[in-house]
């Protein structure tokens, strides 16, 4: 019990940190969106010359413009990066809420959904990392940016690659730890099936019934002393277990000191008086 409580407290703490991270991403994404709208209203639009497309340059590197070229990203909004950033924050917050609800209510279903969402998030992150690592032309797959802001961000990540690498690895390890804790808490809250007479007698439906249902018949006449069938049944856990599992009435096979009067000893025959003649 103490170990389960410790695991639940640790899982709640880590989920709280995950929720704070998600809310932070949502708040910062909203701030970026407000800045984007403000800069868009005050931006300078270049005129089209020789069939070239127009671009908008922003003061912040993350608020970069997306060229309106004829590729698969034509249908993306200009602020797709902000929407993606907010979406990741919402996903983290929803996952953390699912984990908190499952931990507080000790719901096996919520903990299972939480574990599934975590493993999906880890797989997506690993797939994205593998795509960047193995595909050397991954930069060509991104929407083109002629403002130079993407190169600025890329150079910043490359210069601080050691820090960025450990931060990314720490995030994956953190999520893997959450996944393992969720599995442990789920296993601790799973109801056990007891099938031994020495273990806790869990309340469950009585599946096995006695082979013979004894029904007391009305008796008329002079009342007599209680017989075996009229004895009250015992209500201790072992007797209840025997009646449930085997359909046995333990009052017939066990000794109860309170009913010791049932077994009346036969009166001892009087010893023969000594001094009398005995005929052989």
From Swiss-Prot:
Q: Record's family?
A: Belongs to the tetraspanin (TM4SF) family.
Keyword set for this entry?
Membrane, Phosphoprotein, Transmembrane, Transmembrane helix, Vacuole
* Gene Ontology biological process: viral replication complex formation and maintenance
Tissue specificity statement from the Swiss-Prot or TrEMBL entry: Expressed in rosette leaves.
Q: What does this protein do?
A: Necessary for the efficient intracellular multiplication of tobamoviruses, being a component of the replication complex.
> Which organism encodes this protein?
Arabidopsis thaliana (Mouse-ear cress)
Q: Where is the composition biased (Basic and acidic residues)?
A: 271-280
Name this polypeptide is given = Tobamovirus multiplication protein 2A
Extracellular topological domain residue ranges:
35-78, 135-162
Q: Which residues cross the membrane?
A: 14-34, 79-99, 114-134, 163-183
